[in-house]
UniProtKB/Swiss-Prot annotation:
GO terms of biological process kind: amino acid transport
SUPFAM superfamilies: Periplasmic binding protein-like I
Family: Belongs to the leucine-binding protein family.
Entry protein name: Leu/Ile/Val-binding protein homolog 5
Provenance organism: Brucella suis biovar 1 (strain 1330)
Function: Component of an amino-acid transport system.
Keywords on record: Amino-acid transport, Signal, Transport
Signal peptide residue numbers: 1-29
Entry superkingdom: Bacteria
Pfam families: Peripla_BP_6
Amino acid sequence: MIGTRLPAWTRVLACGVAGLSLMTISAKAEDVITLGASVQLSGPVANTGRYYQDAYNITIDKINAAGGVKVDGKPYKLALKIYDNQSNVNLSVRQYTQLVTTDKVNFLLGPFASNFALADSVISEKYRIPMVQGGGASDEIYSRNFKYIFGTLAPASNYFGSTVEMLKGLDPKVTNVALVYADDSFDISVADGTRKLLKDAGFTIAADEKFATNSTDFTSLISQIKSKNVDAVLVAGHETEVLNFVRQSKSLAFDPKLYSFTVGVPTEDFRKALGKDANYAFGMTAWLPSADLKDRWFGDAAKFETEYKARFNYEPDYHAASGASDVEAFAEAIEKANSLDPQKVRDALASIKFDSLYGPIAFDKQGQINLPQIVVQVQDGKLVEIRGPAGQVNPPQYPMPAWNAR
């Protein structure tokens, strides 16, 4: 039998857990609770990584301004220790190890992207320091029976769930669908779930294609899909991949009735990067600032958006809202546990229920929340909510006109 050598980060749990001195990290004399994180601040996905750094900072500052977090009647300030993992998962794992063993942070906030959360959560599990992360949605993260990882993104397998429901009622009818996805943990989970959703809904999957993560050239893939005469294209990828897919679709005059993307569409950057070519693109989000979501620290989602944009000079999207709720989850759990003991805070996280600017937070047995995805579309340069949890909100612009008819 030939064994498969596992990546270094998958072997961490096997290394010396027995005899490990578990840390109950107390606050220092300055009464500070330190949250540690490794985030993509440079490299291919830095544009999304910044949401997490900025969300962590603004939320920590907001909680501190309101008096901090109380433990046994004593107020503690929150602090952030953050590293740039340069979009390198192996570096991220080393940095989380450093945060726990050298920096001795109290608790961990997550990185962006499922492959990072999948790897980095091995560190939180090994050292039994809870991590709350809002950057990874892959079902694989929560399938390992880990006890110290909690996530505020809904399961990737159902990301296109609301979109498939919308497809059922479109006129002209959608029959043939292309499913396109990147070769990484998140996008594979999306594809696996979407494949079943499409089949159960009676759609024909005319193309089912995987591309290499961080691909820049989609011409061959688009040409292949174009030859299938599909009605709709569902793409699971990251923002740069999505931008390149749209640009190259235009250059190849590929104009299905509809295309929808897992990421990018809700962001201001997407609309700025593509200009008028962003129109008609569908996407999804678990959060909109217009939602009626009340919050203990910011007041509501709209106030969070206003403060975030004023401070960082760009609009927050669901990544930022999710990151903010991660910090809030720790504040709630620490106060519920009335302790800084990692095990007690972990147990409190497993049972907390509270309203955040992002939505209601309550973790299931696997450590994940389940918020419905909202279908959005770019219409005349603006982001429009098309379908919410209760059904259609605004009419979609469908079918998408040919590129030469715009």
